[in-house]
C-alpha cells in the first residue's frame, strides 16, 4: 500500500468529489487547522453534537444502544463532560474510491489536552459524512470546536482493487447523512 500525496488528494477531490467541500490549502490562522496537508486531509466537524451522559444509568450495549444516554446540542463549542464522549460528524462528505482505504488520526492539539478522536477506517466504496467520537480522558470538562480541524484522514492505495467494496456489500453505514449511532444487523 502507498500513502497518497497532496496532489493526488486534490485531483480526486476536484475530479471525483472524493471530499466535498474541499479546501486545497491549510487554514490555520487562530484555529485548529483544516484542509489539505502533505499526505492527508484535515477535516472539520459540524456543530451538531450528541453528548453522552450518565443521567440514565444503564449498561452501554452496542447491540442495543440506550438512545436516552445522549443530549443533542447544536452549538459552535461543545463541552465534553469529564471521562465521557461526544459524537459529531464531519463537515465534509467523503466518496472513497474502490482501491483506497482511509485511516483517521487525531489532531495533536486535541491529544495534548487529553481529547482523543476515534473513527474506524473509511472502506473502499464507502461514502457519507463521517461520524467521529471524541473522548475526554481528563477528570475536567473539555472543549471541542465546530467548523475547525478535528482529525486527519490518510489515504492508502491498495496494490489492486478489492473484489467487493463497502457499497457492493451494502454496508450498514453507507451514505450516512447525520451522526449515526451503532447499528447491528439481525440477519
Curated annotation (Swiss-Prot):
SUPFAM superfamilies per record: dUTPase-like
**Residues reported to bind dCTP:** 107-112, 131-133, 152, 166, 175-176
Q: Which CDD domains match?
A: trimeric_dUTPase (cd07557)
Cite a single GO MF annotation: nucleotide binding
UniProt-listed InterPro entries = dCTP_deaminase, dUTPase-like_sf, dUTPase_trimeric
Q: What is its EC number?
A: 3.5.4.13
A family per Pfam = DCD
> How does the record describe its quaternary structure?
Homotrimer.
Q: Which family does it belong to?
A: Belongs to the dCTP deaminase family.
Q: What is this protein called?
A: dCTP deaminase
- UniProt source species: Ehrlichia canis (strain Jake)
Amino acid at each position: 500500500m502507498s500513502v497518497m500525496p497532496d496532489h493526488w488528494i486534490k485531483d480526486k477531490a476536484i475530479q471525483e468529489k472524493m471530499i466535498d467541500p474541499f479546501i486545497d490549502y491549510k487554514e490555520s490562522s487562530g484555529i485548529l487547522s483544516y484542509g489539505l496537508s502533505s499526505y492527508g486531509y484535515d477535516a472539520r466537524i459540524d456543530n451538531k453534537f450528541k453528548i453522552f451522559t450518565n443521567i440514565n444509568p444503564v449498561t452501554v450495549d452496542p447491540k442495543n444502544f440506550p438512545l436516552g444516554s445522549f443530549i443533542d446540542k447544536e452549538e459552535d463549542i461543545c463541552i465534553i463532560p469529564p471521562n465521557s464522549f461526544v459524537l459529531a460528524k464531519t463537515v465534509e462528505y467523503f466518496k472513497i474510491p474502490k482501491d483506497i482505504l482511509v485511516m483517521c488520526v487525531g489532531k495533536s492539539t486535541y491529544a495534548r489536552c487529553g481529547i482523543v478522536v476515534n473513527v474506524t477506517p473509511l472502506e473502499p466504496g464507502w461514502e457519507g459524512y463521517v461520524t467521529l467520537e471524541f473522548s475526554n480522558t481528563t477528570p475536567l470538562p473539555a472543549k471541542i470546536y465546530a467548523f475547525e480541524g478535528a482529525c486527519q484522514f490518510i489515504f492508502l492505495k491498495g496494490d489492486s482493487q478489492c473484489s467487493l467494496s463497502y457499497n457492493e456489500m451494502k454496508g450498514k453505514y453507507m451514505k450516512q447523512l447525520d451522526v449515526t449511532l451503532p447499528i447491528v444487523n439481525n440477519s
